[in-house]
Amino acid sequence: YLCPCCYSWVQFACLPLHEVQVLVRISPPMEEVVIVGGARTPFCEWQGGKRGDGQAGGLLKDYSALKLGEIAIKGALEKTNTSPDDVDHVVMGYALQTCDQAIFGARHAGLGAGIPQEVPMLTLSRICGSGVQSIVTGAQMIMLGEAETVISGGMENMSQAPHILRGMRDTYKLGRPPKEGTVLEKGMEDYLFTNLLDGMCGSFMAQTSDEICKRKGVTRQETDEFAALSHSRTANSIDNNIWEQEIVKVGDIGHKDEDHVVRDSTSESLGELRTAFGPESLVTAGNASGVVDGAAAVVIKSASRAKADGDEPLARIVSWGIVGLEPAIMAYGPVPSSRKALDKAGLTIDDIDRWEINEAFAGQAVACVKDLGLDISKVNVNGGAVGIGHPLAATGTRLVLTLAHELKRSNGRYGVATACIGGGQGIAMVIEAI
């Protein structure tokens, strides 16, 4: 069993009672896991949307998710002075698999970044929590002694989400394209749009935010005030280069090109926008997270490996919590997952200096902040997904990386990064600045 005091694996065998003897073998304590550093690409408005200034989006539309992941991995290696030869495993989240080579996922991203072909690589999906899950999975590998250095991250290109035709297998042979003029008879499906609907509960993701807001008494005014604050904080972070140290360029596209934020947002202007699901809805284009393209990656190591390498880690991973909940209120996932992570860490809300809560929707974030009893001055202090956007699998890694840098910047100790997850889940991670 796992000793709750020292996290050592204890194996024992009890002999017959007449033999007064107990055999015990204690394995070495599990390694602590540290976040050495990382990098992310700019998060840029998708091709189908409009930037905050009203211009058409799509700065990253021609970079597949795998290419963005490759760039983020390269950036993480460079920013941490980590040799590709020292990497034991690559774990990358990829939720909305949109490119023609998507099935190869982390493998192509890692090989493209120069990781040796002998290194195993894993692609995973916990949808919006994938970027945190990849860090959890990497940490578990290290704690079990299967690796010492892991690249964890997430990658997404929403611009490349295809329109698809289902039910064509009985008409066209493998590898043969449909003839022009015949394909529309079956009906074309928007792959991005259909994946915003959870068929298990019959709700769009935005409707789960409306549902939890209804249950928790969140108002439209509170929602738009939070959204305006997110836009303002995001603009401040871009203008004052707060995120510059974590961003790696994609070609000539850098941290100043993060373009979803609407700089002149006020609660009054946001309050004039039409809601998505009728008069009872709170969700609008101005208080929901942006659809953007981007990727992020971090280098995590065992504490002993980091010490031997002469690293100066940003933080150590303290605990994590992953939960399931009613699909119709998936947006509430940060609350039970954060409580679980804090309980495992032996910490309370008062111990946490900074929170990074994914703003899938402003109303959902307000509900979580209120229910956890958080001080808004400690939450998403540099902006969040309403302002910067939410590239699904990449978001969680950005939350953790941004949190680690912010704890250093603010001289804080403990922080929590958390996200809701489509389908009815939540994930949270507690880290401690070093």
Sequence positions of predicted segments:
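Conserved active-site "lid/cap" helical segment
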Residues: P28-A95, C99-A109, A113, T208-R220, ...
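N-terminal extracellular/periplasmic Venus flytrap/periplasmic-binding protein-like
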Residues: A39-P42, W46-K50, G54-I71, K79, ...
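Conserved beta-ketoacyl condensing-enzyme motif
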Residues: L59-V150, G154-K173, I247-E258, A328-I329, ...
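Conserved catalytic cysteine-centered active-site region
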Residues: Y63, Y94-V150, E185-M188, M200-F204, ...
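Active-site-proximal alpha-helical scaffold in enzymes
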Residues: L124-E156, I164, C213-I242, A297-S304, ...
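Flexible glycine-/small-residue-enriched beta->alpha junction loops
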Residues: T149-E211
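Active-site pocket-lining segment
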Residues: D210, E246, I253, V318-G387
